[in-house]
Design a protein with these regions (language model features):
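Functionally critical mobile loop/hinge segments
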Residues: 200-308
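Generic N-terminal targeting/processing segments that precede catalytic cores or assembly contacts
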Residues: 2-124, 147-148, 257, 264-308
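Acidic-glycine-rich active-site phosphate/pyrophosphate-binding loop
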Residues: 103-120, 155-174, 219-227, 262
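Alpha-helical support elements that line or immediately flank enzyme active sites
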Residues: 139-150, 195-203
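Glycine- and small hydrophobic-enriched segments that form the cores of compact globular domains
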Residues: 101, 128-135, 147, 152, ...
Length: 308
């Protein structure tokens, strides 16, 4: 039996969105962007006035910015194990000296995504979006878009409301934990959230946000959670870069008019079913995938001892 964090109910004036389809319809009928619908929902859910709800989300944005800054300064940050760290700075220097194959905007997104998760791996402060293991995906997207689209703070906070509101639907119907659904549930969900939010700040419609979300999920469907030594470091840090890149590609395809053959809500349902179909070795146990390779097992033994 699946227990939802929240579900379709009516408590006086309060209604919790239960599907992407419902959000898109309300946006089209009301003329309001998804972000506005989610702000209204959050005010009703929390009982807080709008300015307090807004300020709380703004603090999330500030936390993200601080993590990106910390991970990109000096020589970077390093985890206690030494498995990860310093690679955001390497990308930063690469961007200065070379013409990247994927373009500077993409590399900026990758840098910020990796910087954030290197901070997480070094026991720093990040904003879980939707989890700490996938905390770099949204910062990777939003700060690149800030520079590329000249976003102001209001647009960036709205980006986070859109991402969070759609992420709630994913969480309620498929889950967001690697232990239950694999990395597709963490980085995959973050990528979908970011893709949809990117469409909105770029001037797209709610329907296009829905299409971007669906394509982002489909592109990462089946991604396993196989952290070496059970630590949120390898391959987790770099997978956030993939999540950011996938989100931007999915957003661009949606803005170009491309559509997902499978609707967003059905993609979320597939995400749930695939997650439950993954063996436990590929759901955050550190036993299968890359963690189960000879090198992965050797690293585990070195960190925790041969009998770990």
């Amino acid at each position: 039996m699946k227990i939802l964090f929240a579900y379709k109910v009516n408590w006086g004036v309060f209604t919790m969105y239960d599907s992407i389809k419902e959000i898109v319809k309300d946006s089209m009928d009301s003329g309001k962007p998804i972000s506005e619908l989610i702000i209204e929902q959050e005010c009703n859910l929390s009982g807080l006035p709008r300015h307090e709800v807004w300020d709380k989300m703004k603090r999330n944005l500030q936390t993200m910015r601080a993590a990106v800054k910390k991970g990109s300064e000096g020589e970077g940050v390093f985890s206690k194990t030494g498995l990860t760290g310093g690679e955001a700075v390497k990308i930063k220097e690469y961007r200065k000296k070379h013409r990247s194959l994927s373009g500077d905007s993409m590399m900026e997104a990758i840098q910020d995504a990796i910087a954030t998760n290197e901070v997480n791996a070094s026991m720093g402060i990040v904003c879980a979006t939707p989890t700490a293991g996938s905390a770099g995906t949204l910062p990777g997207i939003i700060f690149m878009l800030e520079n590329r689209l000249k976003l102001d703070e209001e647009q960036m906070v709205r980006f986070l409301f859109t991402a969070g509101g759609l992420g709630m639907v994913i969480a309620n119907h498929a889950g967001i934990a690697g232990a239950t659904g694999g990395c597709q549930a963490e980085v995959g969900s973050a990528s979908a959230m970011g893709a949809a939010a990117a469409v909105e700040v770029a001037g797209g419609t709610a329907e296009q946000s829905s299409q971007a979300l669906a394509m982002a999920i489909a592109n990462l469907l089946g991604l396993v959670c196989d952290p070496i030594a059970g630590l949120v470091e390898v391959p987790c840090v770099k997978r956030n870069a993939i999540g950011a890149g996938n989100a931007l590609l999915s957003a661009d395809m949606a803005l170009a008019g491309c559509v997902s053959v499978i609707p967003a809500d059905e993609c979320i349902e597939a995400l749930d079913k695939v997650g439950h179909g993954l063996p436990e070795t590929l759901r955050e146990t550190g036993l299968g995938g890359l963690a189960g390779t000879p090198t992965g097992q050797a690293i585990r033994a070195k960190i925790f001892g041969d009998n770990a």
